[in-house]
Every structure is written in C-alpha cells, then in structure tokens.
Amino acid sequence: MAQALGEDLVQPPELQDDSSSLGSDSELSGPGPYRQADRYGFIGGSSAEPGPGHPPADLIRQREMKWVEMTSHWEKTMSRRYKKVKMQCRKGIPSALRARCWPLLCGAHVCQKNSPGTYQELAEAPGDPQWMETIGRDLHRQFPLHEMFVSPQGHGQQGLLQVLKAYTLYRPEQGYCQAQGPVAAVLLMHLPPEEAFWCLVQICEVYLPGYYGPHMEAVRLDAEVFMALLRRLLPHVHKHLQQVGVGPLLYLPEWFLCLFARSLPFPTVLRVWDAFLSEGARVLFRVGLTLVRLALGTAEQRGACPGLLETLGALRAIPPAQLQEEAFMSQVHSVVLSERDLQREIKAQLAQLPDSAPGPPPRPQVRLAGAQAIFEAQQLAGVRRGAKPEVPRIVVQPPEEPRPPRRKPQTRGKTFHGLLTRARGPPIEGPPRPQRGSTSFLDTRF
C-alpha cells in the first residue's frame, strides 16, 4: 500500500506556489530574476517579499525575544507554562528560531543526547541496496526548486539520502516510505542532518506511529475517524462524498502522510508544522476538516462537483488566496475538536475495525498528544533511567557473647529492714539523749 499511495503524492498545478516544480535544470539557468530565491529558499518563488498577512518586523522581534526566553529555561517553561508555548506556536514560530524550537518541541534533543554517535554510525554504514535504489529515485522529486535540492550532488540531496538511509537502518522492520521524503526535506531546510534525523524519528514513532510502516494501519484507522468527524461536523459534505463515492483514502493519505507539505503554500506549511509539533495529530484533523469545508462547504460548490473526479479536483484545487497563512490558520484553530473528542472517536472506530483487516492492528495508545505529553514521558523516563537500582546486601552479624546467668540476691536469714539499711549505708547516729537527774520511778515507789 505504501508504494500505491506514494505514486499519488504529486502536488496539483493549482497549489504549486513556491514549492512547485519547474521540470528541468535548464529552466534554472534562465534569466537572472528567474533564478532569484525567495526568503524560504525557493527559486522563482512568490514569497520574496512579506505578504499582506505577514506580521511586522517589530512584532516578529518581540516574538523572537519570547521564544529565546522560553527556550533558555525549557524544562521550567514546559513544566509550568505550556499554555504559553501552545499559544506562541499557534501564532507561528519565528523563522530564525525554528531550528532551535522544533527539536525541543518534539523531544529530538533528548533522543540525540541519549544516543550519542548513533546517527554517525548509521550514516557511515552501507544501506540496504533495495532501499537505497528506491530512495535514490525519489531524491529529485523533493522540492526540486529549492536551492538546497537543485543539484543531485548538492548538500541537500546528499543529506536527504543520508537521513532516509539512516532511518531504514534504524528501523529495518519499517524501511522506507515515499512520504518520508518531503517530511525529511522540510526538516533539512531548517536543521542539520543529525537533528533532522531525530526529528524524523519522533514524527514517525511518537506523533504518527503506524503511518510509515509497510501496512499503514494507523492511516486506515485515522481515515475512518476523519469520516466520522465529517459526519458530525460537516454532515452535508459527508453526504456528498458518500454519494459520489469519494472515500477518505483517495485524498487523506497525501495530506496526513506528508504533513501537508505537498498540499499547501510553504508559509502555511510551516505554520501547520508549528502547531502540529505542539499539539500533535489533532492539528492534522483540524487542517483536513478546514480544507474540505473550503472546497465543498457551500451548496454551490457541491453542485459543481457531480462526480468523483470533479470532487477530487475541488479538494486539490482550493484557491491559494484562501490558503494564506494567517487567515487559514485562524480557521484551523476555530475547529471545535478537543483531544478528548478525538480519542473517543478513535476508540469507537477501533472497535468497528474488522478482524480480517490486513496487517497488524493499529495501536493508537502509543501516540502521544503533542509536546507536553512527550516532555512528560521523557521526564519520567529520565527519572527511571537516573535512579540507581538498590543492590541487595547480605549482612552477617557476629555471634553474641554468652551472658553470665543472673544471680539471685542472698536474702535468706535477713530481714527486709536489714536489706534497706545495707542498701542505704550505716545508720546515722543522732545527738545523745540527756541524762535525767531525778530518781527513777521504782526508787520512789518502793
């Protein structure tokens, strides 16, 4: 299924903004203005100048100072002020600090610290020839107009090759999924290869476990959850999709597996990632629901899509003006979907899955709900790892010396008064009695 889904991960022409492909290297050697890169590194992109929704420089500077303060005391911030972190992530992490903030949010810095030298060993080791061939065929497809990935021998494509190869060696039972390519490429645009690798590990194993394996069992489960949420939140859209036969697996894997990297303008992609690394997979559902509503929310839009092809085209051809980062993310965060609601729906759909479904059963319980849950789990693991186990000690006491038998006091033939006198010492003699000078009674009587 991974290969089948991977072949469809091609961005439609209508959404090819600054992350689109122009086709060949000959076009990159055209006139000077055409080769100019925008502020995100895309050649010929439309983001060279800040857009109308871009915050002013003073506001960006204030946000940068807030992030510097929060990241300087990260453990204290996450322990006591996570709500502030979430709010700042929703406003957007400043571009200059994403390289510092993304590894902290996803916990990649802890993984890298606990596994020193692991990435270097994986990067230097020879890869599986099967996976290396597949990865090599996909390298030129990942943002070919970005200045990092223009040349096959450039540091961008070579770094992407090393990161993806390292993951196949790190998790050989999962191997390589084509959707990991754009995810790793976006990470490499902001991070060194080692940090990008550990962020990719966290995304694949903590945020979205079961997404990039050979069976993609978690993608199937989340597709059913998404349809259930559509039925509850957008019933008219859900009915239309059912009538024209558009199932969630026809459009959702491209969105969720690539974290919308191929479906949205690049500035909006970064804002989605900021929120996703903070709040977890719930953000993906909110973004997906927003896209469906923008494409098919009105009766006129649904009436213009009488069949399957027209409906899929509408989902992939949302006007870029509606996907501008500030306005779009405001709609995303207004979607009423709490983590409790999402978990309740996941449990309900998990109970309805047939036992004959291919592959292993999904394990949604291993998915952590964002940066706060990851931080708490890593703190708990650190406490357990740092606590030294008590080594049992056998203490042998020396034998006690035998005590002499207790002797009974010799009281035979002795009065109690004598014992008290002996105990108290000799009696104290008082003053001598005066001698009476008179005659005794007997002498006077007789």
From Swiss-Prot:
Interaction with calcineurin as annotated region, ranges: 406-446
Give UniProt keywords alphabetically: GTPase activation
Q: List the biased-composition ranges (Basic residues).
A: 405-415
Out of the domains of life, which is the source?
Eukaryota
Q: Alphabetically, which GO biological process terms does the record hold? A: B cell activation; calcineurin-NFAT signaling cascade; ERK1 and ERK2 cascade; negative regulation of B cell activation; negative regulation of calcineurin-NFAT signaling cascade; negative regulation of ERK1 and ERK2 cascade; retrograde transport, endosome to Golgi
Q: Which GO terms describe its molecular function?
A: GTPase activator activity
Q: Where is this site: Arginine finger?
A: 137
Question: What residues does the record give for site: Glutamine finger?
Answer: 178
- Compositional bias (Low complexity) at which positions? 18-33
Protein's job: Inhibits the Ras signaling pathway through its intrinsic Ras GTPase-activating protein (GAP) activity. Acts as a negative feedback inhibitor of the calcineurin signaling pathway that also mediates crosstalk between calcineurin and Ras.
What's the name of the protein?
Carabin
Species name: Homo sapiens
